Amino acid sequence: MKTAIVAGCRTPFLRSGSEFADLPAIELGKVAVREALARSGLRGEDVDHLVYGTVVHDTQAPNIAREVGLAVLPKTVPAVTVSRACSSANQAITDGTTLIEVGQATGVLAGMG
């Protein structure tokens, strides 16, 4: 099975506690997911799985992937949060690729930031 990245979008790089300090992580995630869908031309119904990487967990959303997924994607789309410090988004993309390669999904939204 071949896989391809069809679009990219991420939250901005900022110093912790700076410009977006008052913006909840879930809100940033929703913006990133909506924009990734828009750039790719895909609809939420085309996504079989959401794999969301995060550097620091938000205590208000311990599984931010599910919170963001419920807000943006169909409720049937499973979502998992990957936490691996600075390489979280890369690990999420790797995990998403694996889901496609083993036949568990055809469309995966993976990465974030």
Regions found by a protein language model. Name each.
Residues M1, L42-E45, K75, G103:
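Structured loop/turn residues at beta-strand edges in well-structured enzyme cores
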Residues L50, T81-V82, G113:
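Residue-level "edge-of-site" marker
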Residues D46, V51, L109-A110:
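Short beta-strand segments at enzyme active-site cores
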Residues R34-D48:
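Phosphate/pyrophosphate-binding loops at sites that engage ATP/ADP/AMP, CoA/4′-phosphopantetheine
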Residues M1-A32, A92-G113:
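Conserved beta-strand-centric core segments of catalytic alpha/beta enzyme folds
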Residues R10, V33-A38, G69:
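Short amphipathic alpha-helical segments enriched in leucine
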Residues L23, T54-T106:
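Conserved catalytic cysteine-centered active-site region
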